[in-house]
Swiss-Prot record:
This is Tetraacyldisaccharide 4'-kinase. Its EC number is 2.7.1.130. It catalyses: a lipid A disaccharide + ATP = a lipid IVA + ADP + H(+). PANTHER family: TETRAACYLDISACCHARIDE 4'-KINASE, TETRAACYLDISACCHARIDE 4'-KINASE, MITOCHONDRIAL-RELATED. InterPro entries: LpxK, P-loop_NTPase. Transmembrane segments: none annotated. Keywords: ATP-binding, Kinase, Lipid A biosynthesis, Lipid biosynthesis, Lipid metabolism, Nucleotide-binding, Transferase. Pathway: Glycolipid biosynthesis; lipid IV(A) biosynthesis; lipid IV(A) from (3R)-3-hydroxytetradecanoyl-[acyl-carrier-protein] and UDP-N-acetyl-alpha-D-glucosamine: step 6/6. It comes from Brucella suis (strain ATCC 23445 / NCTC 10510). The lineage of its organism: Bacteria, Pseudomonadati, Pseudomonadota, Alphaproteobacteria, Hyphomicrobiales. Transfers the gamma-phosphate of ATP to the 4'-position of a tetraacyldisaccharide 1-phosphate intermediate (termed DS-1-P) to form tetraacyldisaccharide 1,4'-bis-phosphate (lipid IVA). Belongs to the LpxK family. GO terms for biological process: lipid A biosynthetic process; lipopolysaccharide core region biosynthetic process. It is an enzyme of class 2 (transferase).
Amino acid sequence: MASEAPPFWWDEPDWRALALAPAAWIYGRVSGRRLIRAVPPRVSLPVLCVGNFTVGGAGKTPTAIAFARGAIARGMKPGIVSRGYGGNYSGLHLVDPGHDGARHVGDEPLLLARHAAVALSPDRVKAAEYLKSLGCDFIIMDDGFQSARLHADFSLLVVDASRGIGNGRVIPAGPLRAPLTDQMRKTDALLCIGKGNGADFVIRQAARAGRPIYHAQLRSSSSATVAGRRWLAFAGIGNPDKFYESVRQAGGEVVETHSFADHYSFEPDDIRGLVDMARRQGLGLITTAKDHVRLATMPGVPPEFLSKLAVLDVDLEFDRTDALDHILDTVVERFKSRLHG
């Protein structure tokens, strides 16, 4: 669904949202009821869910990576449970970043596997138990908030500060995966990433519900490569505008942009077109880490293209320096209470 999200979802509600309101009401009733009434199975490990309210990009992957790094810094061994969107594995699979390709396991799991063990499975309990058998002592659930297939001790919902929740309507009238009120009831804290006022409404709703609100920024770790150069920036992610703005914030001049569908599988013609466009205008080519991992594991991609392609790597930085540790502490404390309660 994320790759097919129509642009009108992110604008003020119009006639299309109104026309789809009956279908959205039905979808919302079903998804909201499932979310509220579900009693997900539990595993004997602390579980942090990193999710979002909508389809499309919000910053879940860098958030999951930040928590994996934070857990490792505390002497823990985190494991990540993922569905592997964009891949084709239907059973349990441990991601091998040295051999797996994005078309088989998905781009996000490949990125995550650089930082922690990643188990793919539609059965999230089975994936978590498998990670436990490998010695993992802390589970990060990448997405899965609405699926209710694994109990989370703490659910952190990520929202983009400039994009927010779009028109605030439920699929198919808007990007919400379930009614916001139902999702907020199951939310433990909100993480707002970036600058802007697009998320003001959901921040107010979280505050009214008494949910903690954290703020963070995506900082480029490759500014030395990006700054002072003119770029053709391209991306096949849920929110490409966030990437283009990150290139600018890193000091690059974005002259041209080319947006593809989320999790897009590039074709040879796409690569030739990008190279020709950049050459004609004397621009460098830059893309996201997710797009790069897809391109790097695709058969037939020219090595010279990959060698000249710049990648914008970003790290998540909380505005409050103690925020990450506080959330990790809360997850572990809730797990202990669950275990002994």
